[in-house]
Amino acid sequence: MQYKNQNLTHFVKAAGUAAKLSPGGLKTILNFMQKTPALLSDIGNNEDASVYQISRDLALVQTLDFITPIVDSAYHFGAIAAANALSDVFAMGAEVINALNIVGFDTCNHDVNILKELLEGANDKVQECNALVVGGHTIESTELFFGLSVTGKVHPSKFIANNTSKIGDCIILTKPLGTGILSTALKAQMLNQKHLDIMLKNMMELNYKASQIALKFHPSAMSDVTGFGLLGHLKEMLNKNISFEIFQNEILFLEGAKEYFNMGLIPAGAYKNLEFIKELIPDLNEEKLLLCDPQTSGGLLISISEKESLECLKKLEDENIQAKIIAKVVNKQENDIIIS
């Protein structure tokens, strides 16, 4: 579908996953949620999706994600929002069954054709991972938002948690960073066409294939990088026995991201993420803001044994996935995250 400038980002305060509430604030209000033996995922660790056991051989994987427009083309926005929502199921090592549309529609500024194209974009992405859109719900809203409620399935003993990395593992990141920076440049009408095309390709790419490849190498943990930025999601992958050593020079960024960053085109969400992570990295400064950039439809973080990591990386690269080993899991250190 050809990209159309339909001014979607003009009518929203914040774009994509940069509109998420501060992660620190959320932790203080979610401690009332109840546990049950059938709930296999950990409520307290911000898992990517819930895993609920139905039978000895079946667990349902459920997630919900919606975002404000991050691009100005309705079809592309729908596809990106769908890829972003589906990613949570892939990060759990699960298979998507179906999805429901969630729509808040700004009838004052957009006509119904915008909604039609948006839903078409989402439907195409859901079909790409062999699943179905089976319905949804719409309301009128002062700002446009869209996402999916996604249901998947997995064997109860085979889902991949986000905080079970093993000492000695390598951490593979499967997409470059920078969508928050580039989308901020787009909203400021300063993003050139080449960089827009690169950003679109990155965000519309499903994490489905990367997840399928990773599962062949028995990862010890997985997550995806979205609104809390790389450092924020690595924080969620920590446990009491480990720290992460990040190889900063190995991290890939979308073309143009560093230039726009140096121009000051930085989303407010990056500063929120910086505050959230500062307690773990005392010497963290604004030069590291790129590592806090809120991603929309970002890549997977795959924790995998060092022995398997290079072969896994090669398989990902063979599928044109821009993957890199960006960190190593080490014994617990004074600082939980070390940037080298």
UniProtKB/Swiss-Prot annotation:
Protein's GO biological process: selenocysteine biosynthetic process
Protein name: Selenide, water dikinase
Pfam families reported for this sequence: AIRS (PF00586), AIRS_C (PF02769)
Co-factor(s): Mg(2+)
Gene3D superfamilies named among the record's database cross-references: PurM-like C-terminal domain, PurM-like, N-terminal domain
Source species of the chain: Campylobacter jejuni (strain RM1221)
Listed GO MF terms: ATP binding; magnesium ion binding; selenide, water dikinase activity
Annotated binding of ATP, by residue: 20, 45-47, 65, 88, 136-138
